[in-house]
A protein has these predicted regions:
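Short, surface-exposed amphipathic charged segments that create phosphate/polyanion-binding patches used
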Residues: 113-117
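N-terminal glycine/serine-rich phosphate-binding loop of ATP-dependent small-molecule kinases
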Residues: 1-96, 108, 112, 124
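Active-site neighborhood for divalent-cation/phosphate handling
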Residues: 118, 123-132
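Carbohydrate-associated surface elements
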Residues: 103
Length: 132
């Protein structure tokens, strides 16, 4: 039975992978970098495959540093950055880079929608403010 918890945080510039014991003590951690793409002014995108690759590069080293066998992992928690959506094909393959929280290409659309629907109503419906 597993006795350790694995945390994976997909951040803006890197993923962080960490293993904790049941008392919350850090056993080992590591970081895997990836890039932000800026193809046009106001655009900020990332390739979800880069996220996956960074986790796959980082995880083995964290487990090795912690001296914990993967079968001893009881659970995995994953945190992602804001509300980025990933477009996948019918086989689960990434179709394109995804806009991330600092992408502002939808600014005009957000202004129009916010003018028609109260900001508090939008928040009540989806749990997030409408912003580019």
């Amino acid at each position: 039975m597993g006795t350790y918890l694995l945390g994976i945080d997909i951040g803006t510039s890197a993923c962080k992978v960490a293993v904790f014991d049941q008392k919350g003590r850090l056993m080992a951690s590591g970081t895997g970098d990836y890039r932000v793409y800026y193809p046009h002014p106001g655009w900020a995108e990332q390739d979800p495959q880069d996220w996956w690759n960074a986790v796959c590069r980082t995880l083995p080293g964290v487990l090795e540093k912690s001296h914990i066998h993967p079968r001893k992992i009881a659970g995995i928690g994953i945190a992602g950055q804001s509300w980025s959506a990933v477009a996948l094909d019918h086989e689960g393959q990434v179709l394109c880079r995804t806009p991330i929280w600092m992408d502002t290409r939808a600014s005009e659309i957000c202004r129009e929608v916010n003018a028609k629907i109260r900001a508090d109503r939008i928040f009540d419906l989806c749990g997030n403010p409408l912003q580019p």
